[in-house]
Amino acid sequence: MEEASTLKSLLEQFSKIPGNKVLVHGGGRSATQVATQLGIETKMVEGRRITDEAMLKVVTMVYAGLVNKNIVAQLQANGINSLGLTGADINYMRSDKRKPNPIDYGFVGDVREVNTDILADLIARGIVPVLSPITHDGKGNLLNTNADTIAQEAAVALAKRFDVSLIYCFEKDGVLKDENDDSSVIPLITKADFEAYKADGTIS
């Protein structure tokens, strides 16, 4: 979704959705590109980014800055009054630094709490929150946090106040049984299916 034309189209469609809405974004491809330009090595384990001090600076610049503000600007152009946030902004989401075992992911956060009142207040004011995948621990430290997890946690929290639908958007047509075959979309995944696919390595 980081391709400019694809993102523009997605945001145009998002802007046409009636009623209250929240947008959560990632930006991993852009972060990797900027890191490479800065001579910083990108290390991934099971699809998750190892975030040392240097990489934390990169993802904060890219996620909370470049990507987030570009999305906000495009939404404003579409007539959507939006506000870009990290978890540290107005303290909307706190995380705990992930323990370094069995894998030390560095400055990566696991969500601890969502400030539902803050998000609900923004929504009530007609503001669309645009949430970047950077949170904080409440002790002055920023943490790289999975965007899908942020979307999930925000949806669960807001479901206490609103009728919530959680929609994931990505480049493929769905979850693929074979990542090299775009026609191998799995139309429905139950919890049992998920556990079986994870066990046999179809998904990770």
Residue spans of the language-model regions?
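Nucleotide/pyrophosphate-binding catalytic subdomain
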Residues: 1-204
